[in-house]
Amino acid sequence: MNIVSTRRMFALRFASVLSALGVTTAISPTRAMASGSPPQENGIRKLNSEGKPGSEKDVIMPVVIHKGLIYVSGQGAHDTRDQKEWTIESHTTNVMDKIKKHVEIGGGTMDTVLQANVFLTKIENWDGMHKVFATYFPHGGPARTTVAVAALPGDSLVEINCIAAVAKK
């Protein structure tokens, strides 16, 4: 199974969970992925990692903004160094820097992050991840779920996605 298939399955499962919790979307994930819909539909803004509108060919957008909320897709640390040098702290710092960048692209700040999902390849890495995670939220962190998973794309030790509010100006 390739990364795109894995992420597509995750997106569909995550959408099902959100639906079960009463969170609705303006466009179904299946329709959005299959239709090649334009980057802006029903007030939905889809941005790439440079903050520019995404292409119709992009399957996964790192930033989606809708009704004052910023959805940041899962960010992983795809480390190319020797595995012996990998630490949960270095991976978490890499991921949180990406999260911060994407939240800011969407018009938010780390103080406006409402919720985060953390995926760890080893639950034993929770302490190291949490220590780094906490440094990004000096005024208190968001609601957070942390789960251990069998593997993550690109051999990342951690992947994080989040939802933030657009900051008031």
Name what the model sees in each region.
Residues 90-104:
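Short, well-ordered amphipathic alpha-helical segments that serve as non-catalytic structural scaffolds
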Residues 102-113:
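Phosphate/pyrophosphate-binding loops at sites that engage ATP/ADP/AMP, CoA/4′-phosphopantetheine
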